[in-house]
Each structure stands twice: as C-alpha cells, then as structure tokens.
Regions:
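Alpha-helical transmembrane segments of multi-pass membrane transporters/translocases
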Residues: 209-247
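Short coil/turn motifs that cap or connect alpha-helices
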Residues: 30, 103-104
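A generic "structured core" feature
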Residues: 25, 65, 108-110, 238, ...
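Secretory targeting signals
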Residues: 35-87, 91, 108-176, 185, ...
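Short helix-to-coil transition segments within interhelical loops
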Residues: 96-103
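Aromatic- and glycine-rich beta-strand/loop motifs that create alpha-glucan
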Residues: 2-35
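Short hydrophobic, aromatic-rich alpha-helical segments embedded in or entering the lipid bilayer
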Residues: 13-16, 189-212
Length: 247
C-alpha cells in the first residue's frame, strides 16, 4: 500500500527509470521471435521486387498494409508496450517503483519511451527496407516511414495503459488486434475509425495512392489522431497508477 502523501522527485529521474524499464523488456526470446517478423517482411519485399509487378507502388503498398501495418506493427508493439508496466503488475513487483518518491507520470512516460525505443528498430527499419525492395519508389518508402512510425507510437500509448488496466494484457491486446481491427473494423467506416489501423492505412494510402482497406480518415486527422490518443492513454495510465493498489 502506498504512503498517504508520497514525496515526489523531478523529471531528472526519467532517464534512470527509462533505462530500468528498457532492461526489463529486452530479452533474447522476444527479440528473436519478433525480429523474425521484420525479416519475413524484408524477404517478401525482395520477392515482390524480383517478380517485376505491373504497378510496384500499389503492390508494395498492399503488402506493407496487409502484413506490416496489420501484423508486424501492432503485434510487436503490443508485446513490448504491454510488458513495460504489465509484467511488473503481473508479478507484483510494480510496488517497488510505486513506493519510490517519483511522480507517477514520469513512470508512465519512461515505460512508453522504453517500449517505443525497442519497437522502432524491430518494426520501422525492416518495413522501410521491405518497401524499398519492392521497387515502389520514394512515395512508398516515405509513406511506410510515417505510417509505421506513427503506428508504433499510437499502439505503444494504448498498450502501455492496457498493461496497467488488466492482467494478461498481451491476451487482451491480441483480441483487440485480431477481432476488432481484423474483423469488426471492416464492417463499416464508424467501426474502422476506432481502429488504429485506420490511421496507418490512411497515411500509407495518401502517399501511395493505393486503395487500402480501412483507409477511411481524412489525411489531416490521421496525422493528428496519434498524438491525441497517446496523450489520453498516458493520462489514463497516470491516473490509474495514482489510484490502484499494487501490493
């Protein structure tokens, strides 16, 4: 149980917390398994380029959207972001951070930044390389950078909060990705707008000109929405951490 009036420290402790949480997320099993998704994307991108498609831009965009933005980005980000604070909650060690005289938002931001740091090289880099190898050109590469990067940030905010909200956050996150984004969101534009995938698909479609599933947002909205979602998710996580009993 937390002290009734915890002391607080400044943002100066953020780097130390960031390094601590980064270390808890990185292990060989996760890196090998999720790095495999990136390698698969690179190999398929190379195969598409070698097949000499009629329209490399559209073909490449369809692949990046269906595999990269629909599987690689959300699943990889889920594994690391949900674990950032979720693992500590599940094994009852979050209390060791909770009783420290540190502002709760600093803990949440450190967890979010740690998740993004691990995920970006595992997701954005291989997807950009895959986009390049398809032969789709500069527009496809640029669209992939923006869509995958903003996708990682958005999912990281949501899944960091999810890790605090529920136990077994990985399972709940997979249900969201597979059921809501994979099926329900395809039932209509209103449902699609509640899926992060609509943001990434819209950004990629705006650069590639391809007709992509779930690309239902206005481009301006697709660029603004990630920052709104992340802000709200981290605010919720901070409030949750302030109120919950972790011991």
């Amino acid at each position: 149980v937390a002290p009734s009036v915890p002391a607080v420290r400044s943002i100066g402790v953020l780097p130390a917390l960031y390094r601590l949480l980064l270390g808890t997320q990185v292990n060989r099993t996760r890196l090998a398994a999720l790095g495999g998704l990136g390698m698969a994307a690179i190999l398929v991108g190379f195969a598409i380029g070698r097949s000499d498609p009629v329209d490399p831009l559209v073909t490449g965009a369809a692949f990046i959207n269906s595999f990269g933005l629909s599987v690689t980005v959300p699943v990889t980000t889920l594994v690391f972001a949900s674990a950032a604070l979720g693992d500590l909650t599940d094994d009852n060690t979050l209390v060791y951070l909770w009783v420290r005289p540190v502002r709760r938002w600093v803990v949440v931001v450190a967890a979010f930044l740690a998740a993004v740091t691990v995920t970006v090289p595992l997701v954005v880099v291989p997807l950009v390389l895959a986009a390049f190898l398809t032969g789709g050109g500069r527009d496809l590469v640029t669209g992939t950078v923006l869509a995958s990067g903003l996708g990682v940030i958005t999912y990281a905010g949501l899944f960091t909060a999810l890790g605090l909200r529920v136990r077994r956050a990985l399972v709940w996150g997979l249900l969201y990705i597979l059921i809501w984004e994979g099926f329900v969101a395809r039932g209509g534009d209103n449902a699609a707008r509640l899926a992060v995938r609509s943001v990434t698909a819209t950004i990629l479609a705006s650069w590639s000109g391809a007709d992509l599933r779930l690309a239902v947002l206005a481009p301006r909205t697709a660029y603004i929405a990630p920052f709104v979602v992340v802000g709200l998710a981290l605010l919720y996580a901070t409030r949750r951490l302030n109120r919950q009993d972790v011991a």
